[in-house]
Design a protein with these regions (language model features):
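Metal-dependent nuclease catalytic regions and adjoining charged, substrate-binding loops involved
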Residues: 23-31, 35-45, 50-153, 161-175
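BZIP DNA-binding basic region
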Residues: 20
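Active-site beta-strand-loop-beta-strand hairpin of nuclease catalytic cores
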Residues: 1-17
Length: 175
């Protein structure tokens, strides 16, 4: 974590296409450094907010570079505690509510966000859901990153979660 003259920052580097770097610069010139990340890439801005919230920082320094880091620019983002806590709670809710699917980003599979989504085929095309402990009705998230199998009454290692067992039963919402 680089230290500025008075405040320690979370540091991050994003590598992007030249076109996106130019877009970043236009936003920075128009809106100023502190507003740039949010306008340029909202997902990155939310990530930055969560890094600051959980790390105990109030500033984030993001370097955006072209491929090979031949050209770069940077911006500073300040912690917006209320918004960071909102997104942290939203993520906790998603984990706690494993039997509910989050709302689709779009009803159209051709929406920009859906075109690049790893779950497009499941969400829009009816592809089968991968069978593993995370998709099984008997598994539940517990404290931290761990999962518990209620059928076998055991904590599940990451390796065991990926393999599952022969008694796997898809969550109702995924069936």
């Amino acid at each position: 974590h680089p230290t500025a003259s008075a405040t320690t920052h979370v540091w991050e580097c994003k590598i992007t296409a030249e076109k996106k770097l130019n877009e970043f610069r236009k936003i920075k010139a128009r809106d100023g450094s502190k507003a740039t990340l949010r306008q340029w890439n909202f997902v990155y801005w939310v990530q930055a907010q969560l890094y600051m919230l959980y790390g105990g920082y109030t500033r984030h320094w993001c370097v955006v570079a072209s491929a090979g880091c031949r050209d770069w620019d940077a911006c500073r983002t300040e912690l917006m505690r209320d918004e960071a806590e909102f997104y942290a709670e939203r993520l906790r809710d998603m984990v706690d509510q494993v039997d509910e699917l989050p709302a689709r980003v779009s009803e159209s599979a051709n929406a920009f966000a859906c075109k690049w989504c790893d779950f497009r085929s499941i969400c829009h095309e009816g592809a089968p859901v991968e069978k593993n402990c995370r998709t099984c009705r008997h598994a539940r998230p517990v404290e931290g990153p761990q999962w518990h199998c209620t059928l076998h009454d055991e904590l599940l290692s990451p390796d065991k979660q990926a393999v599952g067992c022969d008694q796997q039963s898809l969550r109702e919402v995924l069936a």
